[in-house]
Amino acid sequence: MAFTGDELARMLQFKDKMISSAGSALRFEKVVQEAMASGIVLQHITCIKVRICDNSDILSDRQLRCLLINGLYPFEGRMSMFGVTEEWEGASAAPERQVVFLLSSTGQVLGYEDGVIFYLSPTFSDFWTTAMEFSCQNAILSNFIAQKSRDEYSDQFQKYFTRMRHTPISLTGVLPRRFQKVESGACVEEDARASMRPIQSDSFGAKGPFCWPTEELLQPSAKKDVGGTVCMALSCQEDNSARHCTIYGLTKTPGIKIMLSRHTQTDRSEAMCDAATQTEDVVDNSSETLFLGGNLVHQSILETEVQATAKNTFDVSDPRIDSVYDTTVVGAMATDDVGCKHVQGGASLAQEKPLKGYCIIATPSECKPNIHWLKSPENAVHESAAVLR
């Protein structure tokens, strides 16, 4: 399902209103009713669609209605329903699966399915960028609900949230031979001329060179260190078929920076397609907002250094990189002060001037994670994480 730019802007507007009003139950419920009347559907980071509504717009059971009125220990106050995600089987009268999302008066987000309540996130804003798991690790069972104190529940929920948000991702790769560190000056010219071949990619639907090396590389010198020249291929799995995009850059230091983005509301297929066809896209790293073809996409940009290891391999492991569900490799940045003045051409997001000392060289093609609906994130790293080759 693709959304137009106006539809995305309207969805993001309601989403921001809900986040800002989450501290007041009455104001939050009013915004939910407005969104329900407008037919707002928001996309979670795990790619499921959350239809914004209250309990008057679903087939609710008695236990859910009591939960909304009386609240639930260990949470204080009443609950407010703000959305539901459903799985339908044909033209049946009732959904095959229905998960209701609730907001407590103290700000925590819970999930409700078939009489079982699951803790999901400590805040409403964190809910949209955190993977969901429905297991005994975060279930609040009515039979054992009074056997723990509020502090014990708080510790349990914090451990769950930390595990979901801070599962590190390791990306490893080996540089192609012609871009590995040159030991003797005799090999410099051969490697440099080999790198003059334009790098082709049909990731964006049109074949053409991403960028060319500078003439500086064509002057061999025994003192010149071209070990900082980096060429890598990033690939993402989608429907068991790899999509490739080559990233090429010139640096003075033996390393690059990977930029990772967390999409919180967008139709990724449409957004990446727009990014490929637009030439005036703007990346504002300070406001953590990315404009793709006129569609506003909220994201959090992380930069992590790629450390050189033995035998010209590179390894990335950064605890700031959250779970595999909300991380997509979208570009590469030069780590030195050369900026873009030594880079000609480039992909659609390449800038003519350095962006805060860095330069976006290229972006991969559509990077929609291959995720099964509401599945546990265990063993999912190899399915949807981008890998370096």
Swiss-Prot record:
A Gene Ontology BP annotation from the UniProt entry: symbiont-mediated perturbation of host apoptosis
Keyword terms, alphabetized: Host cytoplasm, Host nucleus, Host-virus interaction, Modulation of host cell apoptosis by virus
Taxonomy, superkingdom: Viruses
Keyword Repressor among UniProt keywords: no
Localization in the cell: Host cytoplasm; Host nucleus
Gene Ontology cellular component annotations, sorted alphabetically: host cell cytoplasm; host cell nucleus
UniProt KW Thylakoid keyword: no
Function (record text): Plays a role in the inhibition of host apoptosis to facilitate efficient viral replication. Promotes stabilization and inactivation of host TP53 through interaction with host MDM2.
Subunit structure: Interacts with host MDM2; this interaction leads to the stabilization of host TP53.
Protein family according to the UniProt entry: Belongs to the beta-herpesvirinae UL38 protein family.
Protein name: Apoptosis inhibitor U19
Organism: Human herpesvirus 6B (HHV-6 variant B)
